[in-house]
């Protein structure tokens, strides 16, 4: 593939990759290793928002109902201790909550159904007024502690994947609509300037749910500021022991399940053009899929990020780290967790995909090239930066070549590349080669970390780039004019 860039191009490229990132349940933020992983991610990637389950689950201890005396009436109390600890940590790490209202406190729940190792209750409230009061009390407390102006910038999403029976009892659509109506009204009663949305559905019955949800909202004049849904790009997994092995959708069809949502939203005059937030996405939807830890995942996500912003206000990678307990505590550091970072502060290949996209944001002026294999931007100081990828989901071994010509002088340029592929940056392979230790020693972790960094190269060059990418490689490149300004008497390469 050959492309000549003139510098006058201006192509569509909405790089919203850093608006939000996912997390395991909120109570995990009380753990030391969780905070270390989030700091590691924030220092390099700097996400703006974080979204996860479990705000109202019992481990956060917010909703309390008890009797003070044998014959006394039950008293409802709210305990903000853990909530403040979590939010203070987020504030310190310069990340805001994308608030998900869920799951149900046990003493407010209408049933016993739970989900996950940590048993989040997924039944409707037995008293919708108490549920509304809980929402209002929580938001008012956050405003009191962090300030109205700040907290009003925190979006609010009602529940999580109610179209799945595990996440919402019987996947009862009408009951969810009631939950949404009550919840959204409660949010707006605190302050009309809060932004609230839903229905947070996943694939499968998503078309039916989104359409019916918007019809309900329209008919009942419910508050709605944005639409949310989730997106994963694999089929049902084949199970083997602790692991699931799903088949990836072809890269050309990675957004096929999403395409209908924009059309459904825009078919309603009152919702046309509404923001769509994809509040979860990844390749696989299970937390024990080895693909998450691989170079294939990095290349596949690189391809997705180049066009994800075309029709979506934001898209939240699920998740930033591997302190995560939906299926239980993992046995090994490379257990196929969702995270960008493996336990032990080991960046996975997909971490670098995000790091490369972050580099494109600095001094960004415009996009000058976007193809199925690369994206190139021009900066305000006339530097050209780009990312190229070679998604090979069937492991054919095919290589791709990329030849680019830039509107730069033909001499005195520097080319900087950072390469992530199965040979140069593959921490899972390092872990495999040293025997797949379930609990690696400090020295072993250090070795794996050393194998988890891109191969960085520099060279003097003309105004052309020739790049070869192996299977599932991702490469960041940067080319700019950089004349040599040697100190008096210094000659590079001279030793005598």
Residue ranges of each PLM-predicted region?
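Mature N-terminal, pre-catalytic/accessory segment of carbohydrate-active enzymes
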Residues: 1-47, 471, 482-496
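Short, acidic/polar
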Residues: 7, 28-42, 141, 207-217, ...
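Cell-envelope and extracellular/periplasmic
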Residues: 10-28, 32, 54-55, 161-162, ...
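Glycoside hydrolase catalytic-domain groove-lining segments
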Residues: 37, 234-289, 311-322
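Substrate-binding cleft and catalytic face of glycoside hydrolase catalytic domains
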Residues: 45-249, 286
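Aromatic/acidic polysaccharide-binding cleft in carbohydrate-active enzymes
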Residues: 277-397
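Carbohydrate-binding surface patches
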Residues: 371-433, 471-478, 483-486
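Acidic, Ser/Thr/Pro-rich beta/coil linker or hinge segments at domain junctions
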Residues: 409-465, 489-490
